[in-house]
Amino acid sequence: MTVTTERIARIIESKEIMTLLPHRYPFLLVDRVTDYEEGKWLTAIKNVSVNEPCFTGHFPDQPILPGVLILEALAQAMGILAFKTHELSNKELFYFAGVDEARFKRPILPGDQMMLKVEVIRERRGITAFTGVASVNGEVACEAKLMCARR
């Protein structure tokens, strides 16, 4: 007889996200964490609304979520994972410290649900290196290697 145990997703709702990250509207770019494993990976979503402030200028007749905001959303997802992994004081923050090999493969548009996945590559002396992928409907929109620094 084989007993299988199904892993239950670890969800973090927006109210708890706001206790972990200092960001607020319009710069809080993670709506919900759909699952995570401390020190390893995290998946989350950002529902992209036509009412996002960036769309008034990027671009008025053809709104596209700016690539830097996609990268910031990935960094925020990593920040949530870091706060769930480490016991940190309220005064400590994770700063976006670097980005390498960023590739943008499709635009993210109003109405899209952006899926975020971050995975830790290594962590050393307060610096976390990780990979990030943002996708829509299973199609990769952006992928990059990023770094966050704990201060």
Curated annotation (Swiss-Prot):
Reactions mediated catalytically: a (3R)-hydroxyacyl-[ACP] = a (2E)-enoyl-[ACP] + H2O
Known Gene3D superfamilies for this protein? Hotdog Thioesterase
Which GO terms are recorded in the biological process aspect for this UniProt protein? Answer: fatty acid biosynthetic process; lipid A biosynthetic process
Sorted alphabetically, which keywords does the UniProt record give? Cytoplasm, Lipid A biosynthesis, Lipid biosynthesis, Lipid metabolism, Lyase
The top EC class, named as a word, is lyase
Subcellular localization: Cytoplasm
Protein's UniProt keywords contain DNA damage: no
Extract the GO molecular function terms from the UniProt entry: (3R)-hydroxyacyl-[acyl-carrier-protein] dehydratase activity
Pfam families named in the record: FabA (PF07977)
Active site annotation, chain numbering:
H58
Gene Ontology cellular-component terms for this entry are: cytoplasm; membrane
Provide the E.C. number(s) assigned to this enzyme: 4.2.1.59
Q: Which family does it belong to?
A: Belongs to the thioester dehydratase family. FabZ subfamily.
Its biological function? Answer: Involved in unsaturated fatty acids biosynthesis. Catalyzes the dehydration of short chain beta-hydroxyacyl-ACPs and long chain saturated and unsaturated beta-hydroxyacyl-ACPs.
Q: Please name the HAMAP family in this protein's record.
A: FabZ (MF_00406)
Checking PANTHER family in the record gives: 3-HYDROXYACYL-[ACYL-CARRIER-PROTEIN] DEHYDRATASE (PTHR30272:SF1)
- According to UniProt, the name of this protein is 3-hydroxyacyl-[acyl-carrier-protein] dehydratase FabZ
Q: What is the lineage of its organism?
A: Bacteria, Pseudomonadati, Pseudomonadota, Gammaproteobacteria, Pasteurellales
